[in-house]
Amino acid sequence: MEKEKWWFNSMLFNRELEYRCGLSKSTDGIGPIGNTNGSEDPVIDKNIHCWGDSDSSSCNNVDRLFGVRGIRNFISDDTFLVRDSNGDNYSIYFDIENHIFEIDNDRYELESSFSSYLNSSYLNTGSKSNNHYYDRYMYDTKYSWNNHINSCIDNYLDSEIRINSYFSSGGDNYSKSYIYSYICSESVNSIANASSDIKTSANESDSHESDSHMRGKYNDLDINKKYRHLWVQCENCYGLNYKKFFRSKFNICEQCGYHLKMSSSDRIELSIDPGTWDPMDDDMVSVDPIEFHSEEEPYKDRIDSYQKKTGLTEAVQTGIGQLNGIPIAIGVMDFQFMGGSMGSVVGEKITRLIEYATNRSLPVIIVCASGGARMQEGSLSLMQMAKISSASYNYQSNKKLLYVSILTSPTTGGVTASFGMLGDIIIAEPNAYIAFAGKRVIEQTLNKIVPDGSQAAEYLFHKGLFDPIVPRNLLKGVLSELFQLHGFFPVNSNSIK
């Protein structure tokens, strides 16, 4: 029985046609037809990238149009359809062997070929009922060929490049394939297998192994470094996010919704009303209280390097500001600074923040992102757990004020064992890694396997470890409602956004 196949540009699963990705450089500058000399105006709506052994760069907007049997009888293997920024569609004939590159906006030949294909298909089968394209379009005057072609293009311009495909390896079941596109460049010549860039859910038992293999493939690509200034790669689905808009989307992956790590400065900028942020104790820096000895790098030098790298003085930023007009005291930990580890300065800054909020009767927010106590400061770092907890007790129990703890990924160690879990309301981000001891430490200490996902926010939520799980883009609104519910209102009602 003949099986229907969906052809991606007549060649995705056909290794003998991989050379057609060479179209890339010739079409990079396609604008309104007539401009084939590489215009600076990026006129292609979006990119469809290459998977193959070719050394060429990306193929621009080569759209998948039809899924009919015998498609090769309908259109040449070297003919593609593209769309420019004006929404006009053109057929492109490309022959890499004979160095032929032709662009045509006259669809007469294309329509004729398609009509001939339908007629021949009808004659061969002897029944038009076997060809739904024939039935729908050959005799129904409501449809014009132009509308049909445009409709086909629109149906396949999927921003996620998610297409139902039939695996060329055989089988009767259709599967959803997710084609992970990346920018192909001249440097990408190590990818030898086109199917290695396709993640499929067809075989769930091999998903973990394929994910690890895919992660290795992506991490080995030089392109990740070359285009790091343009794209941010998701840790979960390995998809690419445009860096220019990534922060405005709260560092949430557009492909899968995964929450990537976020700097303390970005959190403050996106959470606190503009012009209201007033930092506290930002000149407080760490010293080497126990003269920690390290064969690799002295503690002071390591602090200096992180200060230069992050632009911060320590692993937490504290201050006061307004959230939708409501005055608050907030501390935001930054995992980029020595893993957000809690040393004496971190503990002192958070303690002073809570004491200030106690005196001013302000609600407190602490955003946790930490690997735990800082080992370079020994017992002094452990003392910060008790010091912060003591200040929090006076704030919450004696003054009856509101403390909201926000757990982000990761929140572990001494932070989890102290102020991270002391909030009147404890909020977690989706998929946040929350634990006291990490998975590796537990497995090495107890010689037991820690199940995957047992330290994720969703699992711990069902165990009652915290209150709600709130997506990052909704957090500001949720906090505003919580504060008003507990009697903290905007200083100016007009400032509510």
Swiss-Prot record:
Database matches in PROSITE patterns: COA_CT_NTER
ZnF C4-type: positions: 234-256
Cofactor binding comment, as recorded: Binds 1 zinc ion per subunit.
UniProt GO molecular function: acetyl-CoA carboxylase activity; ATP binding; carboxyl- or carbamoyltransferase activity; zinc ion binding
GO-annotated cellular components: acetyl-CoA carboxylase complex; chloroplast stroma
Family: Belongs to the AccD/PCCB family.
Protein name: Acetyl-coenzyme A carboxylase carboxyl transferase subunit beta, chloroplastic
Gene behind the chain: accD
